[in-house]
Structure formats: structure tokens, C-alpha cells
Amino acid sequence: MGKRLPTEFAINMNLEKMMILQQSELQFVNQFNYFDEYNPCHLYFICKRPRLTINPNKFQVTNEYLSLTFVVQKKNEFEEFELKFENNFSTEDIQLVSDYPHNIFKLTTNGETLVDAKVSPFLQSFPRYYINGDFLDLEVLYIGQSFGVEGARTAPDRLKNHSTLQGIYSEAIINNPDSEIWLALASFNQITITMMDGKTKFTKKELDEDDERRPKVFDKLNWEGINEQQKINFTEAALIKYFQPKYNIIYKDSFPNPAHKTYSECYDLDINAVCIELQTSEMINCYMYSDVVEKAPWHMHEFLLNSTEERKSMFEII
């Protein structure tokens, strides 16, 4: 069994902001000022979910309600479901307009547009229980960095010309004709986790060394801060290791590794672990998953920076 230090530290990179959109909408992201210098967009996920459309031939309207029928495509199978809404428009003279491929629709009356929506975001605006919306969940295909620290503020706009994103996005569309391909832009914030072992009998030398080390590591993590680019690097690597996306190659089997200079500060500080945490059910109203990770509203995983033979996990019960 590996050793444990009297005081152990871990860095938890917690999902702070996430925006989902399609590639053609990247040009509009900066208009919303959703990402800023305090919560910049450094990482992006390329994801897929079933293709969602509306059946314009099954639209119904009465004084009491409007009925819309949506279609979920799963490979070569098509499932329909109906949603009814109270008619608050004080008229039955409402038309549904949707051109092929029926992923966008309008509700109009006398030339006035009442609703103008893309099907997927429209359905995503409803509580999950209301529409049984597991078809809105996102399968992670690729994870990458938007840009380095210097380009953080303009990253969403500059992603329009990001060659790696464009190439993988296009390949995903070709390989998944029954699916919609979505981008999830993400910002992560650091949470420092500290554990002090009051049960293990340490030697005086170990305790003295810990008294010297503890404030240095604490100050570095909480005040001076780890290099921002290194945080982006190990967050990306940890997410790739966790989700094992189809289109990622590096980090799948090689994280963590002390030979990687791109996050060497973690080893210099001799911290115990790095963690990733994503709570997407409330933020974007869907779950994330991959071939190796099941659907869940919340994902958290820790990665020990050393083998268990060298170092005991701070998350194990003492």
C-alpha cells in the first residue's frame, strides 16, 4: 500500500458554464456575452443525438389546445410522439410552416409569426419528465481545446475557423446520417479539495515536512494559482480519459503521466489527484455519455497522479 501525506490536496475542475449549439451558430455566441474573462471558453465537446424533426401533416389546433407531433430518428427507425399545449393565442387560425428537412418550424397567424424554433432546442426547453426526453442526451464523440489562454475571450468566434473542429464535425456528420451533431462549449472552474489525516501515526519528521509544505501548496493552489494553460491541459486530458471519445487519440490510455510536461505543475506540487465534475441536467437539460460511460445527470471522477503502490488515494476511507 502506498504512503499518504499528513495533508493531501486535489484539484477538482468543475463545469461552470456550458452552451450547446451547432457549427453554423458559432458566429453568434459572442453576442450573448455568456463567456467572459472570468469564465472563458477553453474546451469544446463534439456530440451527437438522434435526429429530431416535426411532422407538419399532423398539426392540430382548437380553441383549447395545439397539438404538435415530433419525430425521433434512431438509425432506420422513426418514432413519433405528440405534445399538446394550451391555446393561449385566442384564435384557431394558426398555421404550422416547416420546410424539408423539418428541423425548423413556425407557427403563424395572419402573416404574424407566433413561434419560430429549431426542433431540438424547442424540445430541450421543456422539463425532462414532461417529454421523456432521453433522446436529447448527448453522446460525446470528441473533446478539444478551443484555444490557449491568449485567445480565451474570442474563442467561440474563432472556433469557426478551427481546422480540427471543422474536420471532426464534418466526419461525424458523414458517419452519423441519422443523428444531429452538436457542439458543447464549456468553461471549468477550479475547486481545491484538502484532506488532513488525523488518524495515521506520522513521524515527527513527516509532520515537520508537512508543516513546511502545506502552506506553500495551499497558497499556490488558492492564491497564486496554477498556470492557466496547464489547467486547461489536464482538464482536457482527464475528460478524454474519462469519456474515451471515439475521435480522440491522445490521453485515452496515457493520463495521468509524470512525463507529460503540459501539466507538470501538478507533479511539482505533489498533489494527490485531479478530478473532473460535470452537472449537465440543470445547466443544459440533458445527460452526457459515451461508449464507456453511462448516461447520467452528474459525472465526477478522480485521477490519482501516482500509482496506488506509490501513493494512497486521499478519497479512500482511512
Positions of PLM-derived features:
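Boundary/linker segments flanking structured domains
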Residues: 1-318
